[in-house]
Amino acid sequence: MTAVPTSERAPIAARLAPVLDWLRAHVPAGADLTSDTRKLKTGDVFVAYVLGNVRQRGDGRPHIPQAIEAGVSAVLAEAHGYVVPADAPARILPVDGLSELAGPLAAQWYAVPGPDALRVIGVTGTNGKTSCSQWIAQALSRQGERCAVVGTLGTGFVDALVATGFTTPDAIQLQHSLADLHRAGARAVAMEVSSHGLEQGRADGTRFDIALFTNLTQDHLDYHGTMAEYELAKARLFGWPGLRAAVINRDDAAGGRLLAGLRAGIEAVEYGIDGEAAAQRGAGHWLRATNVRAHRTGTTFDVDGSFGRATVHSPMVGLFNVSNQLGVLGVLLMAGVPWQDALARLEKLQPVSGRMERFGGEDGPLVVVDYAHTPDALEQTLRALAPITGARGGKLWAVFGCGGDRDPGKRPQMGAIAERLAQHVVLTSDNPRSEDPQLILDMIADGMEDPRLAIQIEDRAAAILHAVRHADVHDVIVVAGKGHESTQEIAGRKRPFSDQEHVRLALAARGVNA
C-alpha cells in the first residue's frame, strides 16, 4: 500500500483528505477509531501512531498484529520506518505524521460540530482547573443549554461523570467523547486542558471557543524540566487556531505574559483581586474583586470592572476561590450571559467533590478534604482556613504527603509551608507509587525547621484517624493531596482508598456526625 504523503507545510485539511477518503472507501460506517488495543472491537480502525517528543515516546505499531487478531477492519500506521508486511491480512495505510493528524482526523470522522453547536471552553492552570470547569458547567446548564465536563473527575454531565484516568483524554477518545456529548444534548463543554495534554497533542482537533487561565505555580517539573517549559506548554492554548476569547488571571505573572502575547482579534478579559485597576492600563474587559470578607459559611466580596459593579455572596472559602469565581464569571460573560444573570448563577455554585469539601464541624472538629498537592495550593488552602479556625477558637491541622515518581523539589517546600501555617502537622502517604513512602516523608520533613514537631504516620487511614481522634472540638483539620481520588497507589498497585470515606469513619469513631 502506498503511503499517504504529507508535508510539514501542508494544511491539516489537505493532509487529512486522502486519509478520510481511504477510510470511507474501506471501513464500514459506524466503525470506531482507537489507539488503545484494550478498547478494540471487531470492525474498528486501529490508529498506530508514534509519540516522539523529548518527554514522552511510544510506538503503537508493534501492536498491529494484536489489533488484526482482534478483528479490526483497517489499520492506520505511522509511515516513517514502517513497511507493510506483504502477507498482512488487513488493510493497512501508512500515513506520515500520523500522531499530529490523529485528533483532527477523529474530529472529522465523528463529525464533532463547531462552536455554533458545541461551544468548547478550555481551562488550564496549575490549580483550579477542576473547580472552574465544574462551576462553568453548573452555571451554563442553568441557562437551559446543557454543559458537559471533561476533566480530572471524569467525562460527562456534572451529575453523571465517567472516569477516564486522565485530565485530558487522548486525542481520539476526546473527539469521540465530544461527539457523544453533543448527541446526548450538550451544547457546551467545559474542558480541563493539562500541560501534558497540550504538549502531547491530546487536544489537537478541538475547536476551542474560550480559554481560561487560572494560575501557574510549581508542579510537573519532573516532566517539563523547568518552569519556562511548563509555562510554554500552557501558553499553547492561547495561540489556538480559531480561539475567540481568553479569560486570564492578571494577578499571576504568567497571566500578564499571556495577555501581552495574545494575537489580534482574540477578545480578552483580565481579572484579579485588588491590585492595579485594569482600566488604568487601558484594558478592554476586566474584573476585579475587592473588600473580600471571610466568614464561617463562605465569602463575600465586591466585584467591579468593565461590565458593572456588584456584591457577591459565595458559599466557597479562600482567596483562591474568589479568583476562580472571577475566572468563571469572565467565561460566562464571554459566553453571552448577561451581567446580572451571570452574578446570580455565580452565587448558586455548589462545592466540587474533594475541593474544600467539609465534614463535621458541629459537635466535633471541622475536617476539610482538598486536592491541594502543590506548594501554592497547600499554602492557599491553609491560609483560607486560618480565619475560620480562628473564629472557631481552635487550632489548624495539616494531614498530607507528596506523590511518588513526581517532582521531588516541592516536598521540602510543602513541609515548610505546613510548619509555618498549621499548628499540628501529620505527614502521611499520598500516592507513593514506586518510591519508598518513608523516604518521601523524610524529604517533606527536611523542609521543616523542627521536623520533630511533625508526626509521621505512613498509613494514611491511620493518620486521618489520629488527627480526628486527637483534635479539639474547635479545631480544623485539612486532609490534603488526594481530594476526590478513590484509589491509593503503593508499590505500583492501586487499591481502593477515599479520603472522604476515611474522614467519615474517623468522625463516626469519635461519635461525631459527618
From Swiss-Prot:
Keywords: ATP-binding, Cell cycle, Cell division, Cell shape, Cell wall biogenesis/degradation, Cytoplasm, Ligase, Magnesium, Nucleotide-binding, Peptidoglycan synthesis
Annotated InterPro entries: Mur-like_cat_sf, Mur_ligase_C, Mur_ligase_C_dom_sf, Mur_ligase_cen, MurE/MurF_N, UDP-N-AcMur-Glu-dNH2Pim_ligase
GO terms (BP aspect): cell division; cell wall organization; peptidoglycan biosynthetic process; regulation of cell shape
Superkingdom: Bacteria
Location relative to the cell: Cytoplasm
SUPFAM superfamilies: MurD-like peptide ligases, catalytic domain, MurD-like peptide ligases, peptide-binding domain, MurE/MurF N-terminal domain
Cofactor: Mg(2+)
Post-translational modification: Carboxylation is probably crucial for Mg(2+) binding and, consequently, for the gamma-phosphate positioning of ATP.
Residues given in the record as UDP-N-acetyl-alpha-D-muramoyl-L-alanyl-D-glutamate binding sites: 37, 167-168, 194, 200, 202
EC primary class: ligase
Residues spanned by motif Meso-diaminopimelate recognition motif: 430-433
Task performed by this protein: Catalyzes the addition of meso-diaminopimelic acid to the nucleotide precursor UDP-N-acetylmuramoyl-L-alanyl-D-glutamate (UMAG) in the biosynthesis of bacterial cell-wall peptidoglycan.
Family: Belongs to the MurCDEF family. MurE subfamily.
Stated name of the protein: UDP-N-acetylmuramoyl-L-alanyl-D-glutamate--2,6-diaminopimelate ligase
Organism from which the protein derives: Ralstonia nicotianae (strain ATCC BAA-1114 / GMI1000)
Originating gene: murE
